[in-house]
């Protein structure tokens, strides 16, 4: 509580945590005499940080979005796996979300298949610059080359890069698209 009281505002992840902090009271005693000096209790605001989803936006009833429909028309496969997340720094299979490992596993699982699904990577390294897009495409190609060399694969499944910011409604349309 002493640390929390030094903050202007403390954010917690649940109402339970907020209530525990708000209801916590400790007696402060002199270590030598044991005499009660006062009480330690919450003096600063604590708020719950919403970490859920907005069901008014993310649901199966939402209409399709033109931008998503246009992107998905370019995907020839009837089914695609979707990955959404940042592809952060790190060597092969050492990046935080192991996107490189995901790609490696996907390619190895569906190599040389006549009716392989696609993989849609809705990713960036934290920005949507052209430099970032080119770098990510290069990393995907490096992994494809490594899989071909290691396994002598003659055919690899398609990977599509969706490298842009999307609105919540566009994301919902992507999650609910029939190909995903």
What is each of the regions a protein language model found here?
Residues 16, 52:
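Carbohydrate-associated surface elements
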Residues 24-50:
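P-loop/Walker A phosphate-binding loop and immediately adjacent motor/lid segment at beta-alpha junctions
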């Amino acid at each position: 509580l002493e640390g929390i009281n030094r903050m202007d505002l403390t954010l917690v992840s649940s109402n339970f945590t907020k209530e525990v902090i708000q209801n916590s009271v400790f007696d402060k005693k002199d270590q030598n005499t044991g005499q009660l000096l006062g009480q330690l209790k919450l003096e600063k605001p604590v708020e719950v940080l919403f970490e859920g989803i907005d069901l008014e936006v993310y649901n199966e009833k939402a209409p399709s979005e033109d931008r998503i429909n246009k992107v998905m028309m370019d995907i020839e496969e009837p089914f695609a796996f979707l990955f959404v997340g940042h592809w952060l720094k790190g060597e092969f299979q050492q990046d935080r979300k192991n996107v490189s490992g995901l790609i490696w596993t996907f390619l190895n699982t569906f190599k040389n298949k006549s009716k392989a699904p696609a993989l849609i990577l809705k990713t960036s390294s934290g920005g949507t610059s052209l430099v970032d897009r080119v770098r990510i495409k290069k990393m995907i190609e490096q992994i494809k080359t490594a899989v071909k060399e290691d396994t002598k694969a003659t055919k690899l499944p398609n990977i599509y890069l969706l490298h842009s910011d999307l609105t919540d409604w566009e994301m919902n349309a992507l999650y609910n698209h029939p190909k995903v």
